[in-house]
């Protein structure tokens, strides 16, 4: 008999407390606005990065981006058609921005995964997916050992897009259009610490222009790559 603790798909006091702490910190920040999305905790802040910082990050992405894969490691020509790369944690700008995300949310730096850059050309998209780990996935036992569930997601738009490219939360029936320098922060868990299916989201196809984002995911425990 295989003894696997299936703690990632149920309520968790640890993840609930993480949610409470981040929620309280963001709610106190006058620069941060909570987005009205019943059943989902999602926040936004405009001008989190300036134009120069966005341009520098776009250049880093352009230098290293490769065709995106799914978390399982497979490529899917229809499901995720963007280009992406992990940004070097030793780059001073990447380090500074990761630190600022942690300061904004109150989440421990050691729980944060490497900042990932993504680029979407016209017609490219990432269909509906969750950031939390399905406990039925083949990779879940490995994720348990490297920090556990993903609790919060922070994503920053790095470019204006002439048309399309919205972040779509289909179960909440709302979309957030790309605004250069804006950060979105959402809780992948419900208030009790169980995964929240309402956090499922998609990167809508870019209709005109090029969309750049960086994303940072936070684990419930120290992340071990």
Short names for language-model regions:
Residues 1-185, 189-225:
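Fe(II)/2-oxoglutarate oxygenase catalytic core
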């Amino acid at each position: 008999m295989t003894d696997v603790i299936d703690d990632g798909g149920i309520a968790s006091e640890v993840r609930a407390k993480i949610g409470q702490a981040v929620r309280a910190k963001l709610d106190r920040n006058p620069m941060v606005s909570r987005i009205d999305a019943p059943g989902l905790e999602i926040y936004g802040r405009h001008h989190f990065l300036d134009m120069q910082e966005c341009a520098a990050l776009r250049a880093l992405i352009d230098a290293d981006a490769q065709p995106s894969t799914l978390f399982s490691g497979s490529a899917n020509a229809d499901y995720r058609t963007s280009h992406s790369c992990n940004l070097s944690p030793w780059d001073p700008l990447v380090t500074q921005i990761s630190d600022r995300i942690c300061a904004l949310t109150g989440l421990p730096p050691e729980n944060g995964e490497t900042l990932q850059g993504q680029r979407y050309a016209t017609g490219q998209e990432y269909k509906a997916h969750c950031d939390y780990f399905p406990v039925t996935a083949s990779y879940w036992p490995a994720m348990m050992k490297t920090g556990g569930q993903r609790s919060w997601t922070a994503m920053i738009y790095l470019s204006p897009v002439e048309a399309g490219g919205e972040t779509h939360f289909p179960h909440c029936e709302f979309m957030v259009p790309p605004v250069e320098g804006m950060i979105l922060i959402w809780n992948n868990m419900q208030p009790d610490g169980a995964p929240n299916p309402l956090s499922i989201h998609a990167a809508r196809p870019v209709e005109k222009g090029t969309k750049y984002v960086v994303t940072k995911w936070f684990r419930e425990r120290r992340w071990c790559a």
